[in-house]
Amino acid sequence: MKKFLFSLCLLSSTVLASPQSELTERLNQNAGFEAGFTQKVLSPEGDVLMQGEGDVKILRPNLFRWHTQTPDENLLVTDGNTLWYYNPFVEQVTLMGLEKATTQTPFVLLTRNKASDWDNYSVSQNGDAFTVSPKADSAVKSEFIVRIQENGKVTGFSVVEQDGQRSDFDFTKFEAKKPAKDNFTFAIPDGVDIDDQR
């Protein structure tokens, strides 16, 4: 009988947990991770517009390195204050303040967990898929679907734009470990154009 009641209590607490608190709990299981990714961009009709791949490193809070290798190389990296976007093809680096640059993207939820980050979103859950939707009065217009297992392993995410275009990112070689902090700095190469928007 005790075992049954204990199981019932566990079940009740699981049922009562909101999708937002469940997502927060899963995200909080890892202080950081590294993974490879594949990307597929689909038109509203489902046609493949682009495919790519790269790797990502996240160290919570606020540190990330997103390196797209194909089809066109670019690098997005932040030290928690400055966000660098480097495009080697056009030989340009853009510098932005992290807070300003990430205010209107739900991707920030993967990289930190401030209570105020959730103010613009509502969350629904379907198994291991959590749909993070902008509230009606939010400046954010895209929907974010993060796929994360109970143990905190992020298997990927999707971004659905207002016009129906969709970007799917699937993570491979996921490692739940803290990447070294030296991954989150950027030395500007000689000779590149600098667009400082901080």
From Swiss-Prot:
Recorded superkingdom: Bacteria
GO CC terms in record: outer membrane-bounded periplasmic space
Keywords assigned by UniProt, alphabetized: Chaperone, Periplasm, Protein transport, Signal, Transport
InterPro entries per the UniProt record, alphabetical: LolA/LolB/LppX (IPR029046), OM_lipoprot_carrier_LolA-like (IPR004564), OM_lipoprot_carrier_LolA_Pbac (IPR018323)
One Pfam family matching this protein: LolA
Gene3D superfamilies in the record: Lipoprotein localisation LolA/LolB/LppX
Compartment(s) of residence: Periplasm
N-terminal signal peptide: 1-17
GO biological process: lipoprotein localization to outer membrane; lipoprotein transport
Major localization class: periplasm
Family assignment from sequence similarity: Belongs to the LolA family.
Oligomeric and partner information: Monomer.
Task performed by this protein: Participates in the translocation of lipoproteins from the inner membrane to the outer membrane. Only forms a complex with a lipoprotein if the residue after the N-terminal Cys is not an aspartate (The Asp acts as a targeting signal to indicate that the lipoprotein should stay in the inner membrane).
PANTHER family reported in the protein's UniProt record: OUTER-MEMBRANE LIPOPROTEIN CARRIER PROTEIN (PTHR35869:SF1)
Protein's recorded name: Outer-membrane lipoprotein carrier protein
Organism: Aliivibrio fischeri (strain ATCC 700601 / ES114)
